[in-house]
């Protein structure tokens, strides 16, 4: 069996759909929302790598590496903010985020 680009696109679309569903179905837990955003970014990366391999061009793979770097920084900053928020409030529920003073 030959794995074609359509297989990669189907898997990527499923990952993207699961990520969107994770955001919309679970609005109470911030960690699951962050994980869903990471899943969406990974599905976009899979698209870049699939098209890069299909077109024999390395630009998509380089762009995917940049996206992974930004996603790792975003996850680290998001988790650091959650740790500080949990220390101050004792909860990481989304309902408690909108009562922040700034």
Curated annotation (Swiss-Prot):
GO terms for biological process: ATP synthesis coupled electron transport. The keyword Cell membrane applies. Its EC number is 7.1.1.-. The chain crosses the membrane at residues 5-25, 31-51, 66-86. NDH-1 shuttles electrons from NADH, via FMN and iron-sulfur (Fe-S) centers, to quinones in the respiratory chain. The immediate electron acceptor for the enzyme in this species is believed to be ubiquinone. Couples the redox reaction to proton translocation (for every two electrons transferred, four hydrogen ions are translocated across the cytoplasmic membrane), and thus conserves the redox energy in a proton gradient. PANTHER family: NADH DEHYDROGENASE SUBUNIT 4L-RELATED (PTHR11434:SF21), NADH-UBIQUINONE OXIDOREDUCTASE SUBUNIT ND4L (PTHR11434). This is NADH-quinone oxidoreductase subunit K. It comes from Bartonella henselae (strain ATCC 49882 / DSM 28221 / CCUG 30454 / Houston 1).
